[in-house]
């Protein structure tokens, strides 16, 4: 098949993308087409003033071949449009930055170690300029064009149409639209089939934006480029919606929204337009908020709802500024120009006065917690973070309870009360714990600041000689709930032991003999119904629970994680944690401090409304489903995402449908607000359009949530089987409906879904789901929590980690880009050991853990520059860090590691600071094996390799 005219991942011609003049989102620069601009020859040179690389003559080698060939393609020829996976001409090639190689800058390695061409590695293309020492592959690799030697033919869907006579696909024979559907004025994304076996997935494709949302001209009432929702807030699995349930069912694709209402931990890092005049116009029938896709009627006095078509009156104050006492231009209002907007809510949106921010800390003071340093580290971190806890309205309250086999309440007086001292009250009755002096147990941070500081300083000393091994955490939770339920707030549990007395008592049920067997599934279930029923009661009283778990032994994460799951909280797990290791102490202190500083929404509810004919059918994430379509969050976190499945109940007669997410919440500063996020999508009657506009990362996120649900209800084997069955079903459907049923020796799938098999394999091999007799159930349960809460960019990385080659990274990697000042990352590599050179230095990063892999033949100069040692045997392996040394290469390696942890630039909030493990290829076997489990495309631990996986899929598809 010859090159198609229009490549996937490229925006359509001017006037066709999103709405009228919409520009690509700021975080997607480098992927938009630039019509009319002739391609530049080659790539831009390195900026002047770049730090010069040191010369390692003995270790220099040529990296333009073998496994080190870059995963991108060169710029298109003049007159061509960039194809899927290829940046436009003159645009940066990798991570936003292309560069000419420096022939005078050698790299670490051994010139004799040239590798043959490997499976999945792009082939070098003669005559193309190299990028940072890497050569570009042939254009067919990334464009959906046939492999060399394939017969030429028309491209895109036109090629399918001409080759597969009789099929009503593509422009040759358009499918008949139903009578009520208006003729589509704008073509949608074209479908580019690709052969998964001959044109394999490349990890760099995961950084591409989703297929563009192409709306008809004049879909929105203003020409604002922000009229449709950016993907960092809401991504749909389908960016072209089938008009009927039968077409959706025929496609076998899921229709769901991946929703992340907040893109940062703090408001100032993610500015969303704020409507402060309290003029909120909503539809009288469906209660949707006015948005850029309504229609104004009757000289602008009325507006027609784009969800249910009801005509509503425009509020009189809509065109009037009450503060300035003057008329305003309606077309400048935020809610008509921005798909994401926040309203300050008037009195009628409040059931009671806005609640203050309340944190109740439950400290485990058992022997395990004290001896590991947990009590001292957590108390010190809270003390150091008091200034970071949101308290702008000076209403924030704190409370403290210590827990062993008894409950220890602490009554903290106000700073002005000179005669009172902080007192500890011990309660041993665990069945009905009473509250000794409730008014002194939750104290205002502002009024009691000095006393709180004194208490936190002395707390570790109070229990430093304890020998108590008991933990009545269940009873402590009940007492804490009783204490803060009149106000609502957060209970923060810091525990290093299994609750073994009182309410919610748990038994040691870990049994290594059942790991990897069907009986393992019971270990992932809740052992005590208390944890689910208590969580539901807490949610009703606006109490959210976060768990920080640190046990070096079995702690039953499966049971304890129910508390955050139903209350909008999160479970953080630190296996084998000990403050005696600086890396452990620093990681927890950093994460816990960021957690305390994060702004959260209180008393929140989330609801998704949609165009008539669409219905929200299922909800996934950490919250309590209060009714069929209302999700309740006692506290709304900034670092989680949610998945909502959409059903098509009626035939959709419109060319555009809308889905609107609304989050009603109280800010940390006591202000009631509504965040409204509106997504508009085109509809289609054509199956090819549906597949061409499917978003592989959103689809993976949906199935990650489904797999966790399946694992908890039916077991791990059922979850893995369902993932394989679903992928097989999609491949079979595409083959039957869109590839004419004949694939020869290949495996056809759309270019925009080429990463799906690798992502599903990564999900099946993830520590939460993979078949293994070596994974403790606590580790599994913690991984399942991540698989069902991580924001989409972090989830995709957790499923398919990042691999960077550091010893031969391009000259511009590890230093700031001259234009953006952002550190440039090296191009990512596919997760296969075939990509490794024995003299190399590699970073493997799944977002939770990082491995710095040192090859067995690493040259001495590399070791000296990065680690300050001359011999590999002197290298300290395990948890560690890269020392700060006075040389350019060390600085660049540290910059890459630091940049890989920069979540803000990726449009997500996260407190996670990954551990860094130094791994020697010829070092500790267990550490090496652990790092290798992240190489998804290798065979490991009862899991098949990528080649075997593709072979298995092909066999099942052609059966």
From Swiss-Prot:
Molecular-function GO terms, alphabetical: SNARE binding; zinc ion binding
Superkingdom classification of source: Eukaryota
Membrane topology: Peripheral membrane protein
Segments of this protein annotated with the region Zinc finger-like: 283-308
InterPro entries xref list: ADF-H/Gelsolin-like_dom_sf (IPR029006), Gelsolin-like_dom (IPR007123), Gelsolin-like_dom_sf (IPR036180), Sec23/24_helical_dom (IPR006900), Sec23/24_helical_dom_sf (IPR036175), Sec23/24_trunk_dom (IPR006896), Sec23_24_beta_S (IPR012990), SEC23_SEC24_subfamily (IPR050550)
Annotated localization: Cytoplasm; Cytoplasmic vesicle, COPII-coated vesicle membrane; Endoplasmic reticulum membrane; Golgi apparatus membrane
Biological process (GO), any one: COPII-coated vesicle cargo loading
Keyword line: Cytoplasm, Cytoplasmic vesicle, Endoplasmic reticulum, ER-Golgi transport, Golgi apparatus, Membrane, Metal-binding, Protein transport, Transport, Zinc
Keyword Zinc set for record: yes
Chain intervals with Low complexity compositional bias: 1-35, 165-183
Keyword Nucleotide-binding: no
Disulfide bond residue pairs: none
Pfam families membership: Gelsolin, Sec23_BS, Sec23_helical, Sec23_trunk, zf-Sec23_Sec24
Annotated stretches, region: Disordered: 1-135, 163-184
A cellular-component GO term for this protein: equatorial cell cortex
Binding of Zn(2+), residues: 283, 286, 305, 308
Sequence similarity: Belongs to the SEC23/SEC24 family. SEC24 subfamily.
Quaternary assembly: The COPII coat is composed of at least 5 proteins: the SEC23/24 complex, the SEC13/31 complex, and the protein SAR1. Golgi apparatus membrane; Peripheral membrane protein; Cytoplasmic side.
Function noted in UniProt: Component of the coat protein complex II (COPII) which promotes the formation of transport vesicles from the endoplasmic reticulum (ER). The coat has two main functions, the physical deformation of the endoplasmic reticulum membrane into vesicles and the selection of cargo molecules.
Protein's recorded name: Protein transport protein SEC24
Protein's organism: Pyricularia oryzae (strain 70-15 / ATCC MYA-4617 / FGSC 8958) (Rice blast fungus)
